[in-house]
């Protein structure tokens, strides 16, 4: 086995590690509300989310994978060291923010780290501006859209069930929240499941294992082991690390009842369905946080713990530049030992 093959295997394993930490960090968003409302136990919620994350891989196509793999940086100017540095940089940032209990975006950590390593190797000219434009716009738009939809849905539910007995409403939405949690998990899988595949395709192209033509046409033809491995890694990550972020998302921002959980998840799911179809790698964290804030604000503004929300916003702002710096430092370290990297 030659060095190039070993390096590709290491890259794929790191990509699966990133998926694990994505589950560790991001997939908890899929179950935060259904757990905080006590509709499902954390363990059952993880299984529920994992099933629909897996199904999503076959529903939404690979538009997001194409954006991540070929739409953010010029792949003709990167190397295997860039891909490795990007993956490790994203993982390091995810571990740090998980430890701090901050629900930042693994998606934005990945693209920030990937870009940071690419810039460290080839300068700012390696960036593809139009690929970044829609992503940066939706850093702002996604949580606002989630918040507006959450506010609208919650207001509508209050009006529709204004004369119903609270215990009957609670019982109904405990059942409906299983559907909304499934829908949100589908949206999460549709946006996140393809990101690692895009990175793997970029790594194969950077190492010359696939041609430019194969790289540009490979998005609909990923092998089953890659799909299964990516989803399994994400599910395991959710199982082992999800609750720390679930606690912040589901209870520290605002108190939720089943009706609120249903509205937040539905608002988040609609946002994720739309962006996945458009190939925009939005943050599931940003989306569900905005939806939870929108739902909580229908009670009264003081129902939202704005101090916690403010810390989350600062984490959002820092994610892309911080992960980029971490990855750039890693790349420069590699280049110190291997000037041709």
Predicted feature residues:
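Multi-pass alpha-helical transmembrane bundle typical of ion/small-solute transporters
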Residues: 1-341
């Amino acid at each position: 086995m030659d060095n190039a093959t070993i390096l590709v295997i290491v890259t794929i394993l790191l990509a699966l590690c990133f998926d694990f930490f994505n589950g560790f960090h991001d997939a908890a968003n899929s179950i935060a509300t259904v757990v905080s409302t006590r509709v499902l136990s954390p363990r059952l919620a993880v299984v529920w989310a994992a099933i629909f994350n897996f199904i999503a891989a076959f529903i939404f196509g690979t538009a997001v994978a194409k954006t991540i793999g070929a739409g953010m940086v010029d792949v003709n100017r990167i190397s295997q060291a860039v891909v490795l540095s990007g993956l490790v940089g994203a993982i390091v940032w995810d571990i740090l923010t998980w430890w701090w209990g901050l629900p930042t975006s693994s998606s934005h950590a990945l693209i920030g780290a990937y870009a940071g390593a690419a810039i460290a190797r080839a300068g700012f000219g390696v960036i593809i501006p139009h690929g970044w434009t829609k992503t940066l716009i939706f850093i702002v738009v996604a949580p606002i859209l989630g918040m507006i939809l959450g506010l609208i849905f919650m207001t509508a539910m209050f009006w529709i069930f204004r004369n119903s007995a609270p215990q009957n409403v609670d019982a109904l939405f405990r059942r409906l929240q299983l559907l909304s949690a499934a829908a949100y998990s589908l949206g999460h899988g549709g946006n996140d499941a393809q990101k690692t595949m895009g990175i793997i395709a970029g790594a194969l192209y950077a190492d010359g294992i696939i041609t430019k033509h194969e790289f540009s046409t490979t998005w609909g033809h990923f092998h089953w082991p890659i799909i299964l491995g990516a989803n399994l890694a994400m599910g395991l990550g959710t199982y082992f690390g999800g609750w720390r972020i679930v606690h912040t998302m589901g209870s520290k921002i605002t108190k939720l009842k089943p009706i609120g959980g249903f509205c937040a998840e539905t608002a988040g799911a609609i946002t994720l369905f739309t962006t996945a179809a458009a190939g925009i790698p939005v943050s599931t964290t940003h989306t569900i946080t905005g939806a939870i804030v929108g739902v909580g604000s229908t009670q009264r503004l003081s129902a939202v713990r704005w101090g916690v929300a403010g810390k989350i916003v600062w984490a959002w702002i820092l994610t892309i530049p911080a992960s980029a710096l971490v990855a750039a430092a890693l790349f420069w370290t590699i280049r110190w030992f291997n000037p041709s990297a």
